[in-house]
């Protein structure tokens, strides 16, 4: 059983990874352009300035949970099909389809025109520490 503190820490690690990855992706942005929301704050989990929104026009919600097993199993299946980048399309009744891709690949797709390495941050899972 996990504690509220450990669940919040796990969520915070993912938010920090996204923030740091975006800062590494767009070197023209300052620390003030990409910030992590305070726990419990309304709105997106990673706050982007107007300048950052011009470069990365997304509203970011971070969810770090163990309940994604079926999605990861589908992703592993797609990954085993060949050498290309895997993508999983998911859909529920009365909901629009979603595409699931690797986060680093997503960052690289948004790095078009930049010469920096988009991902300079490794995501550290507490179990690997």
Regions found by a protein language model. Name each.
Residues 1-129:
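Catalytic phosphate/metal-binding cores of nucleic-acid and nucleotide-processing enzymes, i.e., regions
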């Amino acid at each position: 059983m996990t504690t509220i503190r450990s669940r919040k820490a796990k969520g915070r690690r993912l938010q920090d990874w996204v923030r740091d990855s975006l800062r590494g992706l767009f070197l023209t942005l300052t620390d003030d352009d990409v910030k992590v929301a305070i726990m419990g704050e309304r709105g997106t989990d990673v706050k982007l300035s107007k300048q950052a929104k011009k470069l990365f026009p997304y509203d970011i919600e971070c969810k770090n949970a163990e309940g994604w097993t079926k999605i990861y199993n589908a992703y592993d299946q797609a990954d085993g099909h060949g050498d290309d980048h895997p993508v999983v399309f998911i859909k529920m009744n009365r909901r629009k389809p979603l595409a699931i891709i690797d986060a680093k690949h997503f960052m690289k797709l948004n790095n078009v025109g930049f010469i920096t390495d988009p991902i300079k941050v490794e995501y550290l899972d507490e179990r690997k520490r």
